[in-house]
Regions:
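SAM-dependent transferase fold signal centered on methyltransferase-like domains
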Residues: 1-175
């Protein structure tokens, strides 16, 4: 492989392995095209909402205008594409935002995307979906105080709005 692809070989191997993992986690979001055209990093894939969860949430938000304020690679937006009146996505990371734009285009979907800090709202009347970072130093965090940004500042910033916050739970036996 290295002989054929040179310095790109490790990236191609990593992409192939990630897409295999993504097929199980995200495959049902894109039944016609699969995830073979999607872009993500290992960390982004780990943090991405699993397809069944994203679809369940999308059904609960059907008929609403929804702003995914931490859209990352676009998983929630992909689930919302046929159910929300309008879906808006934002993320502070320009690379993940570019991945979201690419991934949604692979599904034939256009979405309103912009670079923004979750603590600086860019919509007014939309339901806000927030998935704060729950990893640091490569480890998953389960205490609300460890989320970045913290839930206190998030809820203060979106006071009076309908907000959906994704919170992880520790595996059984861990607290």
């Amino acid at each position: 492989m290295r002989a054929r692809f040179g310095d790109r070989a490790p990236w191609l191997v990593e992409t192939t392995l990630l897409r295999r993992r993504a097929a199980g986690k995200l495959g049902e979001l894109c039944p016609n095209v699969g995830v073979s055209q999607w872009l993500f990093t290992d960390e982004a894939l780990q943090q991405a909402t699993a397809a069944p969860v994203a679809r369940h949430r999308a059904r609960r938000l059907a008929g609403r205008v929804v702003h995914d304020a931490t859209c990352s690679i676009g998983t929630e937006l992909a689930a919302l594409r046929e159910l929300a009146v309008r879906a808006v996505g934002s993320d502070i990371d320009p690379v993940r935002l570019a991945m979201a734009r690419h991934n949604l285009a692979a599904l034939g979907m256009e979405a309103d995307l912009c670079r923004a800090d979750v603590l600086h709202p860019v919509t007014r009347d939309a339901v806000v979906v927030i998935d704060p970072a729950r990893r640091s130093n490569g480890r998953q965090r389960f205490h609300l105080a460890d989320y970045q940004p913290g839930l206190g500042p998030l809820l203060d910033r979106y006071r009076g709005r309908d907000v959906v916050v994704k919170c992880g739970r520790p595996p059984s036996g861990r607290r």
